[in-house]
UniProtKB/Swiss-Prot annotation:
CDD domains: cpPDZ_HtrA-like. Its EC number is 3.4.21.108. The chain crosses the membrane at residues 63-81. The gene is HtrA2. Residues 324-409 form the PDZ domain. It comes from Drosophila virilis (Fruit fly). Serine protease that shows proteolytic activity against a non-specific substrate beta-casein. Promotes or induces cell death either by direct binding to and inhibition of BIRC proteins (also called inhibitor of apoptosis proteins, IAPs), leading to an increase in caspase activity, or by a BIRC inhibition-independent, caspase-independent and serine protease activity-dependent mechanism. Can antagonize antiapoptotic activity of th/Diap1 by directly inducing the degradation of th/Diap1. It is found in: Mitochondrion intermembrane space; Mitochondrion membrane. One of its GO terms (cellular component) is Nebenkern. It comes from the Eukaryota. SMART domains: PDZ. This is Serine protease HTRA2, mitochondrial.
Length: 421
């Protein structure tokens, strides 16, 4: 198209252009003495724009060489400008507006992520071959609730692990050893203390005002991947502990479809105001996870603070004399129904048991062959219907536990030797 335009312009200029103008240095080409003359013959104009008599002129070819690129450049600029106006693209201003309007999750994370911490449980008996440091036996999450280093997490993240030490890594990468201050095994809550000040603190909201369908964000370190964010909605605000087979707890859990997996335990479940409204606690299957309501957590924190003012730590819960190294969940009829509907290879005849949610690396359960997802149905020939039955089996004092499990559709037997605390 551009070449055709040039050809048309060249023909037009040949036909209608005026005679060549030239400037005279001494005299005109045909005797003109006024300094400016005309030359009707283009043949007297050579390729160097210089004639025999020393006159320099501008032919129609010079005009083309100047005018065509200039015209095409102006035309291209005009077309680009018109296209930018007509093309339905999102401008930077419009994009930023849409992002501000719809990326509310990012705003939540920006406001509270600095207070979330990564918790590692280090095995002081085993050391990494290359670094010489204690290996990580398990991990979890937590969040800062006081500027002077007080951290909230789940009890199962930090207790019942002999010969271990607790280490906390902040969002900025700094790492500190931690001491366990308060523990409530019944509610599965604990606090840690690290020796550092001026930390970012997580705001605590109200779980009593939550509604089903409300957006929430789960923060933590699933599978040791720190600073991980997942989002979902509140599926239920009143999931009773009895429905989950937790007979020793009187808690109405928050149920959410936000992804909570290994390592998320102890991390915050926050609302769109960036306030913690729960503590991530457990997962049954994809889309079904539970958190401890923050109103219940506040009661634990008030009691713990009162104990600290009196000079003693707040430690309650059923004693576990021996350590196996698993996190478990009772399979209630409702949970069994959900599992069977989501898992194709689960036998329809299964009516009871305890789901192994997490196995701590290096623990007796890990050494004995238990795996996450196993369902414990019998221990030492006794039926296991809830998690309390497992604690009773540990308290029997037998050296070994003969455990019958269901792994997929296959029934298996494993032998575990629990450790003394």
């Amino acid at each position: 198209m551009a070449l055709r335009s040039i050809n048309k312009l060249e023909v037009f200029l040949k036909r209608y252009s005026a005679p060549t103008l030239y400037y005279c240095s001494n005299k005109s080409a045909h005797g003109a003495t006024n300094g400016i003359g005309t030359d009707d013959s283009n043949n007297n104009y050579n390729n160097n724009n210089k004639n025999k008599n020393g006159y320099t002129g501008f032919s129609w070819r010079s005009v083309i060489r100047f005018f065509v690129p200039f015209s095409l450049g102006a035309l291209a600029s005009t077309m680009v400008a018109q296209r930018e106006e007509l093309t339905p693209t999102i401008s930077a201003r419009a994009l930023s507006g849409r992002r501000r309007e719809f990326n509310f999750i990012a705003d939540v994370v920006a406001g509270c992520a600095d207070s979330v911490v990564y918790i590692e449980i280090k095995d002081t008996r085993h050391f990494d071959y290359f670094s010489g440091q204690p290996i990580t036996a398990s991990n979890g999450s937590g969040f800062v609730i006081e500027q002077n280093g007080l951290i909230l997490t789940n009890a199962h993240v930090v207790i019942n692990k002999p010969n271990t030490m607790v280490q906390v890594r902040l969002s900025d990468g700094r790492t500190f050893p931690a001491t366990i201050e308060d523990v409530d095994q019944t509610s599965d809550l604990a606090t840690l203390r690290i020796q550092v000040n001026n930390l970012s603190v997580m705001k605590l909201g109200k779980s009593s005002t939550l509604r089903s369908g409300e957006w929430v964000v789960a923060l933590g370190s699933p599978l040791a991947l720190s600073n991980t964010v997942t989002a979902g909605v509140i599926s239920s605000t009143q999931r009773a502990s009895q429905e989950l087979g937790l007979r020793n707890r009187d808690i109405n859990y928050l149920q959410t479809d936000a992804a909570i997996t290994f390592g998320n335990s102890g991390g915050p479940l926050v609302n769109l105001d960036g306030e913690a409204i729960g503590v991530n606690s457990m997962k049954v299957t994809a889309g079904i996870s539970f958190a401890i309501p923050i109103d219940y957590v506040k009661v634990f924190l008030e009691r713990a603070a009162a104990r600290r003012r009196k000079g003693s730590a707040y430690k309650t819960g059923y004693p576990v004399k021996r350590y196996m190294g698993i996190t478990m969940l009772t399979l209630t009829p409702d949970i069994l129904f959900e599992l069977k509907s989501r898992t194709q290879n689960m036998p329809n005849t299964l009516s009871h048991g305890v789901l192994v949610w997490k196995v701590i690396v290096g623990s007796p359960a890990h050494s004995g062959g238990l795996q996450p997802g196993d369902i414990v149905t019998h221990i030492n020939k006794k039926e296991i219907k809830n998690s309390s039955d497992v604690y009773d089996a540990l308290a029997d004092g037998k050296k070994e536990l003969d455990i019958v499990i269901l792994r997929g559709v296959k029934q298996m037997r494993v032998t575990i030797t629990p450790e003394d605390p």
